Regions:
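ATP-dependent carboxylate-amine ligase catalytic core
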Residues: 2-86, 102-106, 132-135
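Short catalytic-loop micro-motif centered on adjacent basic/acidic residues
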Residues: 44-45, 125-128, 250-251, 285-287
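Short glycine/serine- and small hydrophobic-enriched flexible loop segments
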Residues: 56-62, 182-190, 460
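Nucleotide phosphate-binding/pyrophosphate-handling subdomain across enzymes
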Residues: 68-71, 81-92, 96-97, 162-310
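Conserved catalytic-core segment of NTP-binding enzymes
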Residues: 74-147, 265-266, 287, 291-300
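ATP-dependent carboxylate-amine ligase
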Residues: 86-87, 244-248, 255-468
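General small-molecule cofactor/ligand-binding pocket signal
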Residues: 148-152, 240, 250, 397
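Beta-strand-loop-alpha "switch" segments that mediate conformational coupling across diverse proteins
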Residues: 153-159, 317
């Protein structure tokens, strides 16, 4: 799977656990040296990062003699380097969203065409409820590639006559993921000749059922192992809650409009479920970053209704200086470029709040908090300085790295984080006034969302054991 959150070993798992450091090192050098020896002089470059890890993953699975390999596509499907398996047991397409538009296209239909490229002749494929036209594109791709395509039944259909299924992953959107997982698992068990899961009888492509152009796969009787699997599933960085004293961290990597909408629904419900402080003093903080060609304005607009007291923007770097932690390094971007993107996000947040106030005169003005920082050109380092006074600031702050951002948010109240320096790199008055509120609040609720790399950096700082 990809991306990893803390350590690259997370991408290659056996029996649910990342392979050990020794095993990773062993197979890394074995694959690297073999590629080096067989390199074609006409094509001297080694495979890129993701492609190399894909080759390595296949080699690990073959050498370790796994019974089943679950392979997640990197980007799209048709032209992805994972799409070299000629006869998989089954294929699955989860809920579609707009992402990686420069590679996959800027419409759901174009993206659906790319996703459908993983379909194989005679190999059953499943998908979940999709918008009408993208679903039609998937059906057309299935017919083109002679692949029997089925629509997963709703999870509710599995619950008839039994108690409601409990999912380990929170959020309503996880129900469709669970329904897809059940169908994929059933096909594997059916291939193995396991009894008690029912047999999926192939429906001719194009058959309509309940007005749908894609046939609906029937629900089946779930085994105890399936029910337990759904209940015990964990996936770091997705709808994850960490309670550290008065500071509660809500982590959910989401970088498309549909995933941000799901994140907002989950966060609002999760915050409601938490015990309310007796004196009512609660501070809500957003920690956000997005990378690539994503429309951050569209993403941030969806987060405004959460009524955050502060919005914090920072790059995905855990520290300002380059560390020796290769798992967290991205050599394709610089701190300066990343920080410029954060400043753009902050200005967007300011504009969105001002528009919100303009639309509703009863809303309080965002004058009471703010702090816009701009990079000052220096030699060898990056400094942050406050700009000239502006008539209207936003309740937003920009930090140069995650460590500084998290220390400011926690204000020494999270045992995993050191207290912020008395004279830090954030001299704006809003940082000082916000620090007082954060220190005195009975509860601090922090939503960390956007880039999965951001979530991974936060996890590394909040749970050092993940780096071991």
């Amino acid at each position: 799977s990809s991306p990893h959150l803390v350590q690259v070993r997370e991408r290659i798992r056996i029996n649910g656990q990342p392979i050990s450091k020794d095993l990773f090192s062993k197979y890394f050098w074995l694959v690297y040296n073999r590629l080096e020896k067989t390199r074609d002089p006409a094509h001297a470059s080694m495979p890129a990062y993701f492609r190399f890890l894909t080759i390595m993953a296949f080699h690990v699975f073959l050498q370790e003699k796994v019974d089943l390999a679950v392979v997640e596509v990197g980007i799209g499907g048709t032209y992805d380097c994972t799409n070299i398996i000629r006869s998989p047991v089954v294929c699955g397409v989860s809920s579609l969203g707009i992402d990686h538009t420069s590679i996959l296209g800027d419409t759901m239909e174009k993206i659906a065409w790319q996703k459908g490229g993983i379909f194989k002749p005679g190999v059953p494929a499943f998908t979940v409820a999709q918008p009408e036209r993208p679903l039609e594109v998937l059906r057309e791709r299935a017919q083109e590639l002679k692949c029997p395509l089925y629509l997963c039944p709703e999870l509710d259909d599995f619950e008839e006559g039994c108690r409601a299924l409990e999912l380990g992953l929170a959020g309503a959107h996880q129900r469709s993921n669970a329904a897809l997982a059940l169908q994929l698992a059933r096909m594997w068990l059916q291939r193995r000749g396991c009894q008690g899961v029912g047999e999926l009888k192939e429906v001719p492509p194009g058959t309509e059922l309940l007005g749908r152009p894609v046939p609906l796969a029937p629900p089946f009787q779930l085994t105890d192992a399936m029910i337990q699997g759904l209940r015990d599933t964990e996936w770091l960085g997705r709808t994850q809650v960490l309670c550290h004293g008065p500071v509660t961290w809500y982590l959910d990597g989401a970088h498309t409009t549909s995933s941000i909408q799901a994140c907002v629904r989950w966060f609002r419900q999760a915050a409601l479920n938490q015990d309310k402080p007796h004196d009512g003093s609660e501070v809500r903080v957003l920690l956000f970053n997005a990378t690539g060609d994503r429309d951050t304005a569209a993403l941030l607009k969806l987060l405004v209704p959460c009524h955050f007291d502060y919005a914090v923007f920072c790059p995905n770097f855990t520290e300002v200086s380059v560390t020796n932690n290769a798992d967290q390094q991205n050599f394709n971007v610089t701190l300066e470029n990343s920080l410029t993107r954060c400043l753009e996000n902050q200005r967007t947040w300011t504009r969105l709040l001002e528009e919100k106030v303009g639309q509703d005169p009863w809303l309080p003005s965002p004058l009471r908090a703010g702090g816009l920082l701009q990079p000052a050109p220096t030699r060898g380092s990056l400094l942050l300085v406050p700009p000239a006074p502006r008539p209207l600031n936003s309740p937003a702050l920009v930090f140069p790295c995650l460590a500084q951002a998290l220390r400011w948010v926690a204000q020494g109240r999270d045992p995993q984080l050191a207290a912020p320096a008395a004279s830090g790199a954030h001299p704006h008055p809003a940082a000082s006034s916000g620090a007082v509120l954060l220190r005195e609040a009975a509860a601090v609720r922090v939503l960390v969302t956007g880039s999965l790399h951001l979530v991974g950096g936060v996890l590394r700082l909040l749970d050092p054991a993940l780096s071991q």
